[in-house]
Amino acid sequence: MGTLVNGTIPAMKCPKNVAMMKTTSNGVFDGESPLDFAFPLVILQICLVVAVTRSLAFLLRPMRQPRVVAEIIGGILLGPSALGRITSYKNSIFPARSLTVLDTLANLGLLLFLFLVGLEIDLTSLRRTGKKAISIAAAGMLLPFGMGIVTSFAFPEASSSGDNSKVLPFIIFMGVALSITAFGVLARILAELKLLTTDLGRISMNAAAINDVAAWVLLALAVSLSGDRNSPLVPLWVLLSGIAFVIACFLIVPRIFKFISRRCPEGEPIGEMYVCVALCAVLLAGFATDAIGIHAIFGAFVMGVLFPKGHFSDAIVEKIEDLVMGLLLPLYFVMSGLKTDITTIQGVKSWGRLALVIVTACFGKIVGTVSVALLCKVRLRESVVLGVLMNTKGLVELIVLNIGKDRKVLSDQTFAIMVLMAIFTTFITTPIVLALYKPSETTQTHSSVSYKNRKHRRKIENDEEGEKMQQLKVLVCLQSSKDIDPMMKIMEATRGSNETKERFCVYVMHLTQLSERPSSIRMVQKVRSNGLPFWNKKRENSSAVTVAFEASSKLSSVSVRSVTAISPLSTIHEDICSSADSKCTAFVILPFHKQWRSLEKEFETVRSEYQGINKRVLENSPCSVGILVDRGLGDNNSPVASSNFSLSVNVLFFGGCDDREALVYGLRMAEHPGVNLTVVVISGPESARFDRLEAQETSLCSLDEQFLAAIKKRANAARFEERTVNSTEEVVEIIRQFYECDILLVGKSSKGPMVSRLPVMKIECPELGPVGNLIVSNEISTSVSVLVVQQYTGKGPSVVGSVSVPVVETP
């Protein structure tokens, strides 16, 4: 097997007298091993690579490391530095004769990935980049590049004893490797830490984008100078041809794909033919640059940068990103790992070179960035964090190093040293940034403080005129399209009468997990400049779920504004609470983490992580919170249209602040002409009320009585039922008696002598409280939907201030 000119050079070469592997086997029953044939072997290799890299990513997740760190380490572990030292493993799993197929797939994945990276870079935004980002990018590039050139003379490749034709390419490769910033990895770190849309994040991304483009230009120069050339004019022809290719693409590509984009209306599926044309154009661009002598990935990157951004590019990303990121790209890390032999780093000089490279990379990047950032009047702490962020390495670093090694510019030892440097600099980025710059402190100066410490300027008015002037704002959170119908019916009921609907506003938030997919980062970059989700007034770039919710709201008279919150599920509650705080909402409604299966009459847990989200929102919310347990509310035949809308609502009132808030919310619904409200007041016997209650509970009971008395005088739309119970069995019977409705409203922490004595059972959902758990359990066979309400006890907007009921202070 010969050496590839522009492809990759396997670390373990196949002897020329060894025959190429056949594609498929006849099976083990014919005495043939699948490991001796190319196709079954590459399947095993892909599965092994994915299993190892994903396992490492899971282990590194608590340290909030980007997945690229796990993939680089996984490639090294599968290579000669670890498992590759086992001869039987190397000869059976990664034999030299199989590497051509694996290398081809890896480079195909790399080519498509660089196309996706190019799509993340918006030339329009770069044209608007301020002098601050340009200055920081220049300083963060030039100083480490210069220090990299000086450092390169500590390596034998730059000495006089080396190949003189390789000295200049080696110096450039070293300079690029030390000065490059991994744009994609940086974006994911910033998004993970919720810094992507802050001032610091925007400066970092703009500077990294400029850095990335400059690095690719320098890399193209280094590649054109490297290689075995028969004539000294060949590098010049390669360079000129590369420039001509870029100019031709700049003139042709945008026009062609803008024409195609106009033929694909937004909101409609993109035709298969257009997607094939786009992908073939990417492959042909890679073929062209490979034929020129640069590298195939350079053509794909140029196509991505010049590709018009919009719904057409979004559709292409959606179609290919999972295959590329999940299966093909990890193969490139393995091919890199098969070339990385850490055992070649031996002796004091070798380890000294490693330390020198790490110090040079960190010092040059951080000092260069900090010095210029301070001149641009960026605060010292933010300047240091900016320098650390700009020092992020990743896949682009590996690409530079692998091209250098494939073209015999870098030796095995130098290659291993540079790979370890890339891992170290990327690994330390997240912990240093977290130590210096807390995500909770990243709001703009004009935004003041975080939602946890802010006190609302709005006050709850006790006078009737003040209540009429106050607008009720509700934040609705959606997990999937199944939440649309039940939430829309709740919102239609909550809008109240025709007189109050003008003072009712709904904010709908689609909860989306932040992933390693490029589309996630591109969506995060569309949020507002202060780090909070952008509330979409023009309905642009909305998710399918929010668009469907808005379409459903048109049948009603509800005013809806939408947003898509993209965060790690562990911190997405911060987006919910921050948005509720910034919009001064009085109520947040969350979907239950289980979905109701109507045929089986049972719950199914789809995403258990959402239970933790609901708990954290209950703990940190700046307003009242409701959890909607949907058991067919969206399945009935009642339309959402205002003219013929009907909903039967029952409120179970035991006592306490949460029950009072649930009752007030029910009264708001009762203002709607299509809502029938029944309030069931459940109390214990007089002996239990006076003999068993302590002083504080007696005070709460008195507050409940005052509250109910005042409401009965002013609430004409509700029917009140009073029930006195002597045992918990009677409580269960009353609940069964009144569950013949569309939805039950209960408080999360209901008070009263009977609540504490409800049947003891395994509490699977503490966020629902004792009454909510009882209703959704098998103890009561019912399919009624439930809204569990928790009142906000701090200072801020409340549902109480939005309806004509008295405000009762909670002790």
UniProtKB/Swiss-Prot annotation:
General function of this protein: May operate as a cation/H(+) antiporter.
Main location: membrane
Subcellular location(s) per record: Membrane
Membrane topology: Multi-pass membrane protein
Keywords (A to Z) from UniProt: Antiport, Ion transport, Membrane, Potassium, Potassium transport, Transmembrane, Transmembrane helix, Transport
Pfam families referenced in this protein's UniProt entry, alphabetically: CHX17_2nd, CHX17_C, Na_H_Exchanger
Record carries keyword Protein biosynthesis: no
GO MF, one annotated term: antiporter activity
Family: Belongs to the monovalent cation:proton antiporter 2 (CPA2) transporter (TC 2.A.37) family. CHX (TC 2.A.37.4) subfamily.
GO BP annotations listed: potassium ion transport; proton transmembrane transport; regulation of pH
Tissue: Expressed in leaves and roots.
InterPro entries xrefs: Cation/H_exchanger_TM, CPA2_transporter, Na+/solute_symporter_sf
S-S bonds: none
Entry protein name: Cation/H(+) antiporter 16
Transmembrane segments: 33-53, 68-88, 99-119, 136-156, 167-187, 207-227, 233-253, 266-286, 287-307, 315-335, 354-374, 384-404, 415-435
GO CC list: endoplasmic reticulum; membrane
